Amino acid sequence: VTQAVLLGLVQPALCQHLMAHGLPVVGMNAMGQPVAYGEYLDQAVYGEVGKVTAINQDYIQNQLQNGIGVCAPIAISKSGQTLNVNGDVAAAAISRLLEAEKLYLVTDVPGVMVNRHVLNKLTPQKADQLLETQVIKAGMKPKIKAAFDALKHGVKEVEITNELQHSGTNLSVEQFAI
């Protein structure tokens, strides 16, 4: 069911949204060509939930020549099972493995919010403080963790935003030494 919703509704809607802004977009979840491979987190506890362990780099690189890649957060296990993976964690893993320079984490809010204002920039120290005091919670937590994971592993910049025309919260290796 999750796979049908992600591939049949969510991914096409996101692609349409990006194309409406004049961006070249390619959906990258062909059943014959998986984007990501993964393994179960703990099948007894989480069911069909996993983490990305490898990517189909040749396929992805080929598709990216045609536009901005949009892929659903699913991975294929060694046994061929479809695994649900956290979208932010998957995006960070894929960007890291592709040695991408920039990662956009698109969300339903304009960026990391503090007192109803968007933070333009976020350092690890500030993020730790906001996480500790539970200013950052719920769905933003995995985004922050994924963003810093991507930065620690070679991605130079991450933007957390809901808009394509306006900046959200920017995290970059230039703001701090990792």
Residue ranges of predicted features:
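C-terminal catalytic "cap/lid" subdomain
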Residues: V1-I178
